[in-house]
A protein has these predicted regions:
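Conserved small/polar residues in nucleotide/adenosyl-binding loops
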Residues: 153-155
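Glycine-rich, highly charged phosphate/nucleotide-binding loops
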Residues: 50-65, 72-81
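Generic hydrophobic/aromatic pocket-lining and core-packing "Φ" positions
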Residues: 25, 59, 84-85
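Active-site phosphate/pyrophosphate-binding segments
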Residues: 123-151
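Rossmann-fold NAD(P)-binding glycine/threonine-rich loop
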Residues: 101-118
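General beta-strand structural signal in soluble alpha/beta enzymes
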Residues: 13, 37-40, 55, 95-97, ...
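Rossmann-fold NAD(P) dinucleotide-binding segment
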Residues: 65, 78-99
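NAD(P)-binding Rossmann-fold cofactor-contacting core
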Residues: 30-49
Length: 155
């Protein structure tokens, strides 16, 4: 298995202006993750996370303006599947969906879209993914991971 995220990953946070997006986005930024944009419909044009991250109304717009290639999703369960689909159609290569409680029927639709667009999905209902000292996408504390000869995967 290859490394899925690194310091070159260009990250868009879907749901960046919500409380989870703000808190964990700040943690990821502090870790050194290359967050290039955020998406919250209706809030495009503002900057967040200490005025360092531009917010767009759609993932398509964020990709067009920032060349984002990786997305992390912090949206409520009823909107999570649509957020994954939006990211896939916008050309995002890797989507990490933290949201828990996404309806199974919604994920069936997501699976077909991901396959068609060659998008990888980690989640939903996962803590995220980390490449030590390079990129952290998710809710796990960065200090618990140290560089070494072992990789760990939790299924």
């Amino acid at each position: 298995m290859s490394i899925l995220v690194n310091k070159s990953s260009k990250v868009v946070i879907q749901g960046i202006t919500g409380s989870e997006g703000q808190f964990h986005g700040g943690q990821m930024l502090d870790y050194g993750t290359n967050i290039v944009s955020g998406v919250t419909p209706g809030k495009g044009g503002i900057k967040t996370l200490n005025e360092s991250v531009p917010v767009f109304n759609s993932v398509e717009e964020a990709v067009e303006k920032t060349e984002a290639n990786t997305s992390i999703i912090f949206v409520p369960p009823p909107f999570a599947a649509e957020a994954v689909i939006e990211a896939s159609y916008a050309g995002i290569e890797l989507v990490v969906c933290i949201t828990e409680g996404v309806p199974v029927q919604d994920m069936v639709k997501v699976k077909n879209v991901l396959k068609r667009n060659n998008t990888r999905l980690i989640g939903p209902n996962c803590p995220g993914i980390i490449t030590v000292d390079e990129c952290k996408l998710g809710i796990m504390p960065g200090f618990i991971c140290k560089r070494g000869n072992l990789s760990l995967i939790h299924i």
